[in-house]
From Swiss-Prot:
GO terms for cellular component: cytosol; succinate-CoA ligase complex. It comes from the Bacteria. It comes from Psychrobacter sp. (strain PRwf-1). Its EC number is 6.2.1.5. The gene is sucC. This is Succinate--CoA ligase [ADP-forming] subunit beta. Disulfide bonds: none annotated. One of its GO terms (molecular function) is ATP binding.
Amino acid sequence: MNLHEYQAKLLLESYGLPIQKGIIAYNGEEAAEAFDKTPTDVAVIKAQVHAGGRGKAGGVKLVKTREEAKEVAESLIGTNLVTYQTDAEGQPVNFVLVAEDMYPVKTELYLGAVVDRATRRVTFMASTEGGVEIEKVAEETPEKIFSITVDPLVGLLPFQAREVGFKLGLEGKQINQFVKLMTGAYKAFVENDFDMIEINPLAVRENGELACVDGKIGVDSNALFRQPKIAALHDPSQENERELKAAEFDLNYVALEGNIGCMVNGAGLAMATMDIIKLYGGKPANFLDVGGGATKDRVVEAFKIILEDSSVQGVLINIFGGIVRCDMIAEAIIAAVKEVNVTVPVVVRLEGNNAELGAKLLDESDVEIISAQGLSDAAQKIVDAVKAA
């Protein structure tokens, strides 16, 4: 689960991090009032969406008067902001952040942290190249990025934070301030079950003070049950409607941009299915894992969610029967196809527990379902069926 910039900043501020102050506005009049309360002569209007690249997309603008603040806010609120991180539809802007202007600054730095799956520990990354996408820095000048891994048994140690501070070119009192900042960021990360935090840019102001000008936080969705305050910050408007509906039925769904819908049990098998569709010249429209305990109701809902995507021209169902029996899945598929009134080609590949019986049920049913033997056969058949449709 992602947080908005203003939510991330308020959370980080509660851990002692210096942030760029701002006020949320839901309309032009509120933006004008927020401008009047801004301590600087110039304010920054920031569209609040769960996506990066807002500045280049016109979602971050400087304003010098309350009238201009109102005008800019009204031009953003109620629209969809399209950035390099969104799809073609963009993300809805429901409110803006009216923030103090912290520029000019001496320099812009980068500080971020993620859960490193290789070491299973929190790893901090830092760079002197702040204010730009860290992916671009990693590609063009990887030597300017350095990292440290934190031992969870002892936590972030002061000498580690000082080491990072010195590598960032900080000196004197800035080092002590940075140690406090980085320690607070780590504490916030662990206590709130983050899976990602990014402060970009971390500015060194003209007076030498540090400030978090922007902040991104991703929270581990699997830990939300023990983070009720964080869960309450969830903004469903920033998520795909089909993904939200899938979550209601415990279906793992991620919308993609292809035309072949996928329904699979197991995340690994789902990824392999998408890969082989691509290999045979098709484009997957989604990732959908119905889980090991697939039932008729879940299969029906999965069909509905897949077919709500108007770009879907065919569906590939790939089921490995382990705990769940393939004959039961076959019955659920037949019932679901009838109930949902599926009009696009459907290819089904069953393997494992009672696979032969499941295939027989499909072949003897009165619905148009194409049976496949093996993963390659299934991928070839769905790609051919979509092309022929």
